[in-house]
């Protein structure tokens, strides 16, 4: 395999967050780019959450083809999008952005990965009417959103109710979800460790 040389025509992509040094995204994406002979590079960039507004103004006009956000930026960048896809609108979080000539389109692809895993286990290809989600964090919201978009009628989310920040945030999300997918019912349940004995 010939060595890859970055040049003035190389397409640039990035993952942004803080902390970011632990991210495996550059390794995964750059290996895929090399394997398929693509003239693309994927970088990890640390972005201080206190400067997210300045970062988004800059990213809009930079020639990055797309970027990925990790915590804690996923919810912070939402208001900077020109267009938001359904999954992202419901969850209130953006993890992927397409930059089309300065027009930012926000996606939440976490939800698609969840549903692909669920569907792969549905070997009898029966309708999935109920899902059980452990936790009420960002990924739980993405999973619930995709389940509703796929027609699931009942979504049960379980968490320790003493974790009020997660619970309050999930309740607000559930309200948005009900408006977008009125056929789905979201139930929140307490996961009390005392009940495990």
Please report, for each region that a protein language model flagged, where it lies by residue.
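Phosphate/diphosphate ligand-binding glycine-rich loop within oxidoreductases
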Residues: 2-123
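NAD(P)-binding Rossmann-fold cofactor-contacting core
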Residues: 152-180
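Residues at the starts of beta-strands that form the adenosine-phosphate
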Residues: 12, 41, 130, 153-155
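Short, solvent-exposed amphipathic alpha-helices that sit
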Residues: 24-34, 138, 142, 146, ...
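General small-molecule cofactor/ligand-binding pocket signal
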Residues: 43-45, 156, 186-189
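Short acidic low-complexity segments
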Residues: 179-197
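Glycine-rich adenosine-cofactor-binding loop
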Residues: 17, 106-111, 118-122, 127-152, ...
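Structured loop/turn residues at beta-strand edges in well-structured enzyme cores
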Residues: 62, 92, 126, 150, ...
């Amino acid at each position: 395999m010939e060595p890859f040389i970055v040049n003035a025509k190389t397409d640039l992509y990035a993952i942004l967050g803080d902390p970011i040094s632990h991210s495996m995204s550059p390794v995964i994406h750059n290996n895929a780019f090399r394997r398929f002979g693509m003239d693309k590079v994927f970088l990890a960039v640390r972005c201080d959450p206190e400067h997210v507004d300045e970062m988004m103004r800059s990213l809009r006009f930079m020639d990055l083809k797309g970027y990925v956000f990790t915590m804690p930026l996923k919810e912070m960048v939402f208001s900077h999008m020109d267009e938001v896809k359904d999954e992202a609108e419901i969850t209130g979080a953006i993890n992927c952005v397409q930059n089309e000539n300065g027009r930012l389109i926000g996606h939440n692809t976490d939800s698609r990965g969840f549903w692909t895993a669920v569907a792969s286990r549905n070997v009898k290809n029966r309708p999935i009417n109920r899902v059980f989600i452990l936790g009420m964090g960002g990924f739980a919201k993405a999973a619930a959103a995709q389940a509703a978009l796929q027609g699931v009628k009942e979504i049960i989310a379980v968490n320790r109710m003493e974790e009020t920040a997660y619970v309050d945030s999930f309740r607000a999300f559930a309200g948005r979800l009900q408006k977008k997918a009125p056929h789905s019912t979201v139930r929140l349940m307490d996961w009390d460790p005392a009940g495990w004995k």
